[in-house]
Structure formats: C-alpha cells, structure tokens
C-alpha cells in the first residue's frame, strides 16, 4: 500500500464490476434512452470512468463522442472537448455518481458558458442513492455512506 487512499480502500468492502456486467448495463442504459425518446446530439464522457461506457453508447446510438477531463478538484478547469453551442441535447456519462458534484458543476458550466438553453442529462452505471444528485439514467444503486464500498471496475484491474 502506497498511500493513505490505498489504506482506506483496503479496509472497505469491494464490489468487482466485471466487463460482462458493464457491457450488459451499458446496453440497458441505451434502452432507457430509447424508451425516454432522448437522442443526444453529443455524448460527453468524463475521464476516466465515463470514457468506456460513453464510447460504447456513442457507437450504439451513432452520436458523436467527446471526452472531457472533469473532476471537482479541477473545477473550473475543464480540459479537452466540450459540447458546441449548437448541441441542444447533451448526455454526460460517468461510471459512478458518488456525490453528484462533478455532474452539477459541469452542467452549470455548460449552461452558463456554452448554451444556456440546452437539455443536459446525466448517466452513470452506478448511483450512490444517498447523494442529493440523481442522474437521469443509471442501472445499479449503492448506499455508500451507510455501507462504505469500493466499486472496482474491470478497467481498473484488468491486468490482475
């Protein structure tokens, strides 16, 4: 263990989220979008966790994909490719919505600086249902404050 962060995670319950689960759940989210009749103009994948499901959804829905490096630590410095002012329907994707703070800040930034009339929606494969922010689309829920758990995504440990 190299850091305080590693020691904290070592003592938490771990949930292993496999490639098969992620592929299946990403497909389920695409079905939710279709049922909701929401066809985004662009999918924004938050680095790093939102890149894989974002790219998968981009191919399935035949929609442009834009990666963005966004975290609450970096706010308001958003790197890479943000939506264009002409993008009216924007789907922002991440692997997990823990507190929702990154989603909220990115939504505010887009609406204040790019297009204040756009429809910004959020998708995460996992949602911490004890946070105040609820994404529009998600597949799995966890109560991370009551039951501290670390969700280990396949892309985080594929070489082990």
Feature roles, as predicted:
Residues 1-160:
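PRPP-associated nucleotide enzymes
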């Amino acid at each position: 263990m190299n850091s305080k962060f590693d020691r904290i995670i070592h003592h938490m319950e771990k949930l292993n989220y496999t490639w098969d689960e992620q592929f299946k759940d990403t497909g389920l989210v695409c079905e939710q979008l279709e049922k909701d009749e929401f066809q985004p103009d662009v999918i924004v994948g938050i680095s790093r966790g939102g890149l894989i499901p974002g790219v998968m959804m981009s191919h399935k829905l035949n929609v442009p994909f834009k990666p963005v490096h966004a975290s609450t630590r970096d706010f308001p410095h958003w790197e890479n490719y943000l939506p264009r002012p002409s993008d009216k329907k924007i789907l922002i994707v991440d692997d997990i919505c823990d507190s929702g703070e990154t989603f909220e800040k990115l939504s505010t930034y887009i609406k204040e600086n790019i297009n204040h009339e756009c429809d910004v929606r959020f998708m995460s494969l996992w949602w911490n249902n004890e946070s105040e922010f609820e994404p529009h689309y998600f597949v799995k829920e966890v109560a991370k404050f009551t039951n501290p758990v670390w969700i280990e995504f396949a892309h985080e440990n594929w070489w082990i």
